[in-house]
UniProtKB/Swiss-Prot annotation:
Protein name: Probable pectinesterase/pectinesterase inhibitor 46
Parts forming coiled coils: none
EC id: 3.1.1.11
GO biological process, alphabetically ordered: cell wall modification; pectin catabolic process; regulation of cell wall pectin metabolic process
Binding site for substrate: T332, Q362, R470, W472
Record field: transmembrane: 25-45
EC supergroup of this enzyme: hydrolase
Location relative to the cell: Membrane
Length: 564
């Protein structure tokens, strides 16, 4: 039976604290609503002043709502945005969240049509068939990612931006594969098929980026502590993070539930067989111990294989080796010796080699398109396109990366920390370029961050021109900071992709690097190259803000520096 007496001092204090907390949350929520109204009003007011044409209308002839106008104004493809959101049911009465979800929904529908178009080809030659096959896989990845986006909370702004950035990357990679086939008609086919879905994806990304900035302004972003004593941090994918805590103690080899050994002393002799046993979409880690040996196989960690932890006997002892390459007819995206798509993947003490050699051009050793992935004390060994950091959030610590042309490339949000980056001797007539970052859209939260690494030659490269990188796409983003550069780096530092300059829209930066190759005195004079960042600007590319690492790396027990 309840007692209805006077509260003691302790209970009274708890009640008062609870009231203050609720009041604080209410103030924040009201502030958020007020700010959204102010910003929407400002945007719409600006649009009205700048637009002398008749206002766009919904399908039923009614004027487009204030929310639709505000959201479409921040997009890169406004006409497509008005067309898309204007067709939303009850668009004039829909909230920004509902309109965003609708934008994602119609993008899924459009990409499903695109997938059908790539799946129905007949009588194709080998190059066309290979490129179309790559597109089928990539568009499938995009659809899956958008479906996950549909079920996520709108407050998960970092996650949503990452996932929508990856959806754009998947479509761009499909286009790259079609261009690689070197058939103008195939390129035109791809451009026509992908135009609508690419614009829709870009618009959804722009909308969530803008909404995230509003939330940031009022400190209402997820994972932030409320100023209360009993507040908890909300982290990305909490069940997965909790599961990873199984890694916190003990020898991972002894914890392994699956053992692979060339000599037959394990359950399996190949890594592929071991992965087939892994439970799909498991929130807890599946630890696979791969004993020393050279495993001659192309390995794929599929998108449904979550939280796989693979441990070897050493980066020069447990080696995965294969030789797929572009010259022999495989699209770059599918040449990887080891390819990872399942989120939460971790590898340590392993080596990944593509043996194709420099004459075979693009030949990837490791390709990663898995969110929240980690590589610790691993070696990636090839020539052109060694390390394909394709998409999502990734972290590499104490790794060794060898290569020649564009050998760290892709469009992930990726941090390389305390790694050795070793350019090697290329083919005759070639020059070395370490990075080729593939950011295509200004709203993508992607880029390559090289932090506290060592850049030195593997071979004698005194007669070889070696550059820090070249901009693969229009918004290419690469930052090298607090790293050692040996004297073999060309004083110009960076190389254009084509012509004699780079797009003004790139973001390249060097910050507090050391060594005889680190001087920025004679660097190229590009508008997009920054050689005098402030500490605050450079810090944006460290683990904590750039890949949200403080929320998911601690559970892996891999050492990392969250900032400077």
């Amino acid at each position: 039976m309840s007692s209805y007496g006077r509260l003691d001092e302790h209970e009274q204090a708890k009640l008062e604290a609870s009231r203050k907390t609720k009041k604080r949350i209410a103030i924040i929520a009201i502030s958020s609503i007020v700010l959204v109204c102010i910003v929407v009003g400002a945007v719409v007011g600006t649009t009205a002043r700048d637009n002398s044409k008749k206002p766009p209308t919904e399908n039923n002839g009614e004027p487009i709502s204030v929310s639709v106008k505000a959201l479409c104004d921040v997009t890169l493809h406004k006409e497509k945005c008005f067309e898309t959101l204007g067709s939303a049911p009850n668009a004039s009465r829909s909230s920004p969240e509902e309109l965003f979800k609708y934008a994602v929904k119609v993008t899924i529908t459009e990409l499903s049509k695109v997938l059908d178009g790539f799946s129905n080809g007949e009588h194709m030659d080998n190059a066309t068939s290979a490129a179309m096959g790559a597109c089928v896989e990539l568009i499938g990845l995009a659809v899956d990612q958008l479906n996950e986006t549909m079920t996520s909370s709108l407050k998960n702004f970092d996650d949503l931006r990452t996932w929508l950035s990856s959806v754009g990357t998947y479509q761009e990679t499909c286009m790259d594969a079609l261009v690689e086939a070197n058939k103008p008609s195939l390129t035109t086919f791809g451009e026509n098929h992908l135009k609508n879905s690419t614009e829709m994806t870009s618009n959804a990304l722009a909308i969530i980026t803008w909404l995230g900035k509003i939330a940031d302004t009022v400190k209402f972003r997820r994972r932030r502590l409320l100023e209360t004593g009993n507040a908890k941090v909300v982290v990305a994918d909490l069940p997965m993070m909790e599961g990873r805590r199984l890694l916190e103690s003990g020898d991972l080899k002894k914890k392994a539930t699956i053992v692979v050994a060339k000599d037959g002393s394990g359950k399996y002799r190949t890594i592929g067989e071991a992965l087939a046993e892994v439970e799909e979409k498991n929130e807890k880690p599946t630890i696979i111990y791969v004993k020393k040996g050279v495993y001659l196989e192309n390995v794929r960690v599929e998108k449904t294989k979550w939280n796989v932890v693979m441990v070897g006997d050493g980066q020069s002892k447990t080696i995965v080796s294969a030789g797929l390459n572009f010259i022999d007819g495989t699209p770059t995206f599918e040449t990887a010796t080891f390819a990872v798509f399942g989120k939460g993947f971790m590898a340590r003490d392993m080596g990944f080699i593509n043996t194709a050699g420099p004459a075979k051009h693009q030949a990837v050793a490791l390709m990663v398109s898995a969110d929240l992935s980690v590589f610790y004390k691993c070696t990636m060994d090839a020539f052109q396109d060694t390390m394909y950091a394709h998409a999502q959030r990734q972290f590499y610590r104490d790794c060794v990366i060898l290569g020649t042309v564009d050998f760290i490339f892709g469009n992930a949000a990726v941090v390389f920390q305390k790694c050795e980056i070793l350019p090697r001797r290329p083919m005759k007539g070639q020059q070395n370029t370490i990075t080729a970052q593939g950011r295509k859209d200004p709203n993508q939260n992607t880029g390559i961050s090289i932090h506290n690494c060592t850049i030195k030659p593997l071979d004698n490269l005194t007669d070889i021109q070696t550059f820090l990188g070249r901009p693969w796409k229009d918004f290419s983003t690469t930052v090298i900071m607090k790293s050692f550069m040996d004297k073999f780096i060309n004083p110009k530092g960076w190389l254009p992709w084509t012509g004699d300059t780079a797009p003004d829209t790139i973001f390249y930066a060097e910050y507090l690097n050391s060594g005889p190759g680190a001087s920025t005195k004679n660097r190229v004079k590009w508008q997009g190259l920054k050689t005098s960042l402030t500490k605050k600007e450079a810090n944006k590319f460290t683990v904590k803000p750039f890949i949200d690492g403080n929320n998911w790396l601690p559970a892996t027990k891999v050492p990392f520096n969250s900032d400077f």
